[in-house]
Amino acid sequence: MTGGKSGGKASGSKSSAQSRSSKAGLAFPVGRVHRLLRKGNYAQRVGAGAPVYLAAVLEYLAAEILELAGNAARDNKKTRIIPRHLQLAIRNDEELNKLLGHVTIAQGGVLPNIHQNLLPKKTAKPGKGPSQEL
């Protein structure tokens, strides 16, 4: 057996450490997700691809919600996303509302909704009706 601490790599190659998140092109931490999967007692063993996939799904969901919340903030002429914008974004999107239907968002408020029976009756305008001339 030759070598020492080279770990099977050629002794001349110097490679900087690269995180699994950067290898996968993700912003969410793959290492942390892997640790949480192991410590959470979800299964005895966790595959190498599972935390990468889960981190990618979480990043996609976060990006989707933040995009819709940013649109809601812009509609309200605000530059900062607040919980109300998150609530409006989630409840107005059919799939996100189904996914997060039982989730309560603190300081989110409610969706504006007025029942049709409570709205004022629409009446015909006096100038638009049939003429009363003979």
Swiss-Prot record:
Compositional bias (Gly residues): 1-10
Chain positions with N5-methylglutamine modification: 107
Gene Ontology biological-process annotations: DNA repair; heterochromatin formation
Any single Pfam family the record assigns to this protein: Histone_H2A_C
Coiled-coil ranges from the UniProt annotation: none
Extent of Low complexity compositional bias: 11-25
Highest taxon of the lineage: Eukaryota
PTM comment, free text: Phosphorylated to form H2AS128ph (gamma-H2A) in response to DNA double-strand breaks (DSBs) generated by exogenous genotoxic agents and by stalled replication forks. Phosphorylation is dependent on the DNA damage checkpoint kinases MEC1/ATR and TEL1/ATM, spreads on either side of a detected DSB site and may mark the surrounding chromatin for recruitment of proteins required for DNA damage signaling and repair. Gamma-H2A is removed from the DNA prior to the strand invasion-primer extension step of the repair process and subsequently dephosphorylated. Acetylated by ESA1 to form H2AK4ac and H2AK7ac.
Disulfide bridge map: none
Record-linked CDD domains: HFD_H2A (cd00074)
Family recorded in the similarity comment: Belongs to the histone H2A family.
Description of how the protein assembles with itself and partners: The nucleosome is a histone octamer containing two molecules each of H2A, H2B, H3 and H4 assembled in one H3-H4 heterotetramer and two H2A-H2B heterodimers. The octamer wraps approximately 147 bp of DNA.
Note from the entry: In contrast to vertebrates and insects, its C-terminus is not monoubiquitinated.
Record note on domains: The [ST]-Q motif constitutes a recognition sequence for kinases from the PI3/PI4-kinase family.
PANTHER family registered for this protein in UniProt: HISTONE H2A
Annotated function: Core component of nucleosome which plays a central role in DNA double strand break (DSB) repair. Nucleosomes wrap and compact DNA into chromatin, limiting DNA accessibility to the cellular machineries which require DNA as a template. Histones thereby play a central role in transcription regulation, DNA repair, DNA replication and chromosomal stability. DNA accessibility is regulated via a complex set of post-translational modifications of histones, also called histone code, and nucleosome remodeling.
Name of the protein: Histone H2A
